């Protein structure tokens, strides 16, 4: 018996006008997730997902490309305004933010949510290069 052709599921259009962009920028990669107000993911992208490998993932250009891709996906769902939460010490923070702004989003607030210890755990040893 021949099996039925599988149908390709299209992404549902969610029609959400405002949301939160979480920009997680580590030393190795930059990940951008756009969520609604409750935290449900609407669109996501990262430098690695856009085809950058190795040390190129940590560049500001890779973060910009990932942010543009994520913005395009979110705009398909009717997203217009964003609050931005930036986390991490990486080099892609500012360029991802600029790319989101250039994509046509109205950015209402920018928050830095990088966790900073109040002298908690002992840090790992310093690198000697």
Curated annotation (Swiss-Prot):
Record-linked Gene3D superfamilies: Ribosomal protein S11
Assigned keywords, A-Z: Ribonucleoprotein, Ribosomal protein, RNA-binding, rRNA-binding
TM helices/strands, residue ranges: none
GO biological process, one term: translation
InterPro entries referenced in this protein's UniProt entry, alphabetically: Ribosomal_uS11, Ribosomal_uS11_bac-type, Ribosomal_uS11_CS, Ribosomal_uS11_sf
Gene Ontology cellular component terms for the protein in this record: ribonucleoprotein complex; ribosome
Cleavable signal peptide: none
Subunit description: Part of the 30S ribosomal subunit. Interacts with proteins S7 and S18. Binds to IF-3.
Family the entry assigns: Belongs to the universal ribosomal protein uS11 family.
Biological role: Located on the platform of the 30S subunit, it bridges several disparate RNA helices of the 16S rRNA. Forms part of the Shine-Dalgarno cleft in the 70S ribosome.
Name the record gives this protein: Small ribosomal subunit protein uS11
């Amino acid at each position: 018996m021949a099996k039925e052709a599988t149908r390709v599921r299209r992404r549902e259009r969610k029609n959400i006008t405002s949301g939160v962009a979480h920009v997680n920028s580590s030393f190795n990669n930059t990940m951008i997730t756009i969520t609604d107000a409750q935290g449900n993911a609407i669109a996501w992208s990262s430098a690695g997902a856009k085809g950058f490998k190795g040390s190129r993932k940590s560049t500001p250009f890779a973060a910009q490309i990932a942010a543009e891709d994520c913005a395009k996906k979110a705009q398909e769902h009717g997203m217009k305004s964003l609050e931005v939460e930036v986390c991490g010490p990486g080099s892609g923070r500012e360029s991802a933010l600029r790319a989101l702004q250039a994509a046509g989003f109205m950015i209402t607030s920018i928050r830095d949510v990088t966790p900073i210890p109040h002298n908690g755990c002992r840090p790992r040893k310093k690198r000697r290069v």
